[in-house]
């Protein structure tokens, strides 16, 4: 059924109205695409004041995300707003938060060339443009492996220069040679083509000096070419996509904010970290300062693609900055893009803590908590976002736990108790961990088991049916040797806990405690109740677990030799299979002679064995047609299996 034109227009108007776009962006201010759609709407209405305000808001939140600056600058350049462009360039290309991106620098070059017309400005204008090219070359182009377009533009500009006299001609030739010299010593795309272009140019310029100049540069070129091939392999899996302008921006080339619990693909993060590690090896044998500039450039490029990955920000901060003042500036920027990140929050709090700035430490934690609470309140009650809510509750609790411990360290127990007081008001927005953490904090710092026990008793009001909480409570009572309280907790909890995995652990814990510190009749009674609840559990498994010492099942180690799976695994493996059993079995198989190992379990899949069985024997081939090591490297580095892609 087709819709009428009126219906289509009404739907479009509804979907793209200013209010709808504003509400969409306000609901998720980390979604850059929502902001760009609103900017696109403003510009379609020639409402450039509002588009500028929104761009300014984005620059404030994401000052190191270069594509936003590039899109904004291009929009202003199209309308010849040179004063605005100049102010924007000063903001993004200088200062503590300077960007370093070739597309952004290319926009700067466009501005310089438009402002300095060679026809009207003559030699003075040319000098300004050449100075701008040199700046971009030193700041950015020598580090960028995809810089061939810049080098072509630079050389093209110099080749178009029509000298007025011999002195100018010689100056032009020297400049061209200097550019080639800089360019051919660094790894970048089309390096080989540029070398051929250079040798031809030298021969056309002066056949007498060509061999000398080419010879001087040859070794550096060969080294750069070799390193570029290596760099290609290192960066093969890296996806570098950025919008050319506002119209081409979409979800495929703009970073998307996703909660960590929904991040399934970390291949890009791993690929970028691999490139950074390779750069740090200094294959180009640069000076310490030059190496740092090059690695910093790659970090800033990684941020363009991994804006919402806290790890890349943390790595960058720890590499680039040696003092806490500089680190704080970048960590603040990182937290604006990742406002719920525990890693970045804790690191920034540390920077303030070493300066004994209690108020700044509190502000740091409170900002992260406020953002988590905002997200939690937005998502709470939506069944489709249940995994988000679980993550938000766990992260919120974790932040509060570290906040509480930090304030104890910084300002004493009363400050920590004040933080815990705030947590109690949040009730079900928190997990049980805050009560457990506070109980241990009270006990460790005051040796006060009464207050700690009261805290855990209070937690039962909210988590009385939480098997994990009951288990942790029992551990604490066991530590204090409060057997009677432990039994009371056990009896009042076993009917409330619905999670059978946790319930089984509660029973086993109580049986183990009675076995060590109680009496055997109580153990037998507990075992009877246990087997009524879990009739499929192997008798000897429970028996051997009961005789653990220092949490080590010696019966299995010394007598059962891991032939029986541990149904009541101490590590909480839902399968019940002892992971150490699996690990040792693999290790034992690897230590067997080849003949025995093949009989017990083939190392190769059946399909591979079938192929090997029909291949001709090696004695039929006099020469090697295939290098197996190269084939393995090729398969590892270049071939993606279907399962890996999914």
Curated annotation (Swiss-Prot):
Its predominant location is nucleus
Keywords attached to this Swiss-Prot or TrEMBL record, sorted alphabetically, are: Cytoplasm, mRNA processing, Nucleus, Repeat
Task: Please give an example of a GO cellular component term from this record.
Answer: cytosol
HAT repeats located where? 46-78, 80-114, 128-160, 171-204, 249-281, 290-322
Q: Which Pfam families match?
A: Suf
Task: Indicate whether Transcription regulation appears among the record's keywords.
Answer: no
TM annotation in the entry: none
| Compartment(s) where it occurs, according to its Swiss-Prot or TrEMBL record | Nucleus; Cytoplasm
User: MF terms per GO, please?
Assistant: mRNA binding
Q: Which domain of life is it from?
A: Eukaryota
GO BP annotation list: mRNA 3'-end processing; response to DNA damage checkpoint signaling
Region named Disordered: 571-599
Q: What InterPro entries does the entry give?
A: HAT, Rna14-like, Suf, TPR-like_helical_dom_sf
Disulfide pattern: none
Its biological purpose: Component of the cleavage factor IA (CFIA) complex, which is involved in the endonucleolytic cleavage during polyadenylation-dependent pre-mRNA 3'-end formation.
From the Swiss-Prot or TrEMBL record, give the protein name.
Answer: mRNA 3'-end-processing protein RNA14
Q: Which species?
A: Candida glabrata (strain ATCC 2001 / BCRC 20586 / JCM 3761 / NBRC 0622 / NRRL Y-65 / CBS 138) (Yeast)
List the top taxonomic levels of the source.
Eukaryota, Fungi, Dikarya, Ascomycota, Saccharomycotina
Q: Which gene encodes it?
A: RNA14
């Amino acid at each position: 059924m087709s819709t009428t034109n009126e219906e289509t227009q009404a739907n479009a108007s509804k979907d793209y109205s200013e209010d709808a776009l504003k509400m969409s962006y306000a609901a998720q201010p980390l979604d850059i695409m929502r902001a760009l759609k609103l900017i696109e709407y403003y510009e379609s209405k020639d409402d450039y004041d509002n588009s500028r305000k929104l761009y300014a808001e984005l620059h404030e939140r994401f000052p190191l995300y270069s594509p936003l600056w590039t899109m904004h600058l291009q929009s202003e350049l199209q309308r010849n707003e040179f004063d605005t462009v100049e102010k924007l360039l000063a903001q993004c290309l200088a200062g503590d938060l300077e960007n370093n991106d070739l597309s952004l620098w290319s926009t700067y070059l466009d501005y310089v060339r438009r402002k300095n017309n060679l026809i009207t400005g003559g030699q003075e204008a040319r000098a300004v443009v050449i100075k701008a090219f040199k700046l971009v070359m030193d700041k950015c182009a020598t580090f960028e492996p995809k810089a061939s377009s810049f080098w072509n533009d630079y050389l093209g500009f110099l080749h178009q220069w029509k000298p007025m006299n011999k002195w100018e001609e010689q100056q032009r030739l020297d400049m061209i040679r200097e550019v080639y010299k800089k360019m051919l010593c660094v790894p970048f795309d089309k390096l080989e083509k540029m070398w051929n272009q250079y040798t031809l140019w030298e021969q056309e310029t002066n056949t007498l000096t060509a061999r000398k100049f080419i010879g001087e540069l040859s070794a550096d070129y060969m080294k750069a070419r070799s390193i570029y091939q290596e760099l290609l392999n290192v960066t093969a899996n890296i996806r570098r996509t950025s919008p050319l302008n506002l119209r081409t921006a979409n979800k495929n080339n703009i970073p998307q904010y996703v909660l960590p619990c929904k991040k399934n693909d970390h291949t890009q993060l791993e690929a970028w970290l691999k490139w950074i590690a390779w750069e740090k090896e200094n294959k180009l044998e640069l000076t310490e300062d030059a190496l740092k500039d090059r690695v910093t450039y790659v970090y800033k490029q990684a941020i363009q693609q991994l804006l919402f990955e806290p790890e890349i920000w943390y790595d960058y901060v720890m590499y680039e900055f040696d003092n806490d003042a500089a680190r704080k500036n970048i960590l603040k920027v990182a937290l604006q893009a990742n406002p719920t990140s525990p890693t970045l929050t804790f690191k920034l709090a540390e920077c303030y803590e070493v300066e004994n700035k209690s108020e700044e430490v509190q502000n740091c934690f409170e900002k992260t908590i406020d953002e988590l609470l905002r997200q939690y309140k937005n998502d709470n009650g939506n069944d489709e976002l249940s995994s988000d809510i679980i993550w938000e509750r766990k992260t919120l609790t974790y932040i509060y736990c570290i906040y509480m411990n930090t304030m104890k360290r910084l300002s004493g127990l009363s400050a920590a108790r004040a933080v815990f007081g705030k947590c109690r008001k949040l009730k079900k927005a928190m997990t049980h961990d805050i009560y457990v953490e506070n109980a241990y904090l009270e006990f460790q710092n005051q040796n006060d088991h009464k207050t700690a026990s009261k805290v855990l008793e209070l937690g039962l009001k909210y988590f009385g049916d939480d098997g994990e909480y009951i288990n942790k409570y029992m551990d604490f009572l066991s530590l204090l040797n409060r057997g009677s309280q432990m039994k009371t907790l056990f009896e009042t909890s076993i009917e409330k806990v619905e999670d059978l995995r946790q319930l089984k652990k509660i029973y086993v814990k109580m049986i183990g405690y009675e076995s060590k510190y109680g009496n055997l009749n109580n153990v037998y009674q507990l075992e009877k109740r246990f087997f009524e609840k879990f009739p499929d559990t192997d008798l000897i498994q429970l028996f051997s677990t009961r005789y653990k010492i220092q949490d080590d099942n010696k019966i299995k180690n010394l007598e059962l030799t891991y032939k029986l799976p541990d149904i009541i695994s101490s590590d909480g493996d839902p399968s019940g299979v002892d992971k150490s059993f699996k690990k040792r079995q693999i290790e034992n198989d690897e230590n067997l002679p080849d003949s025995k190992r093949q009989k017990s379990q083939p190392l190769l899949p059946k399909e591979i064995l079938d192929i090997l069985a029909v291949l001709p024997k090696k004695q039929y081939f006099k020469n090697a047609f295939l290098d197996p090591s190269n084939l393995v490297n090729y398969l590892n580095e270049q071939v993606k299996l279907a399962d890996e892609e999914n």
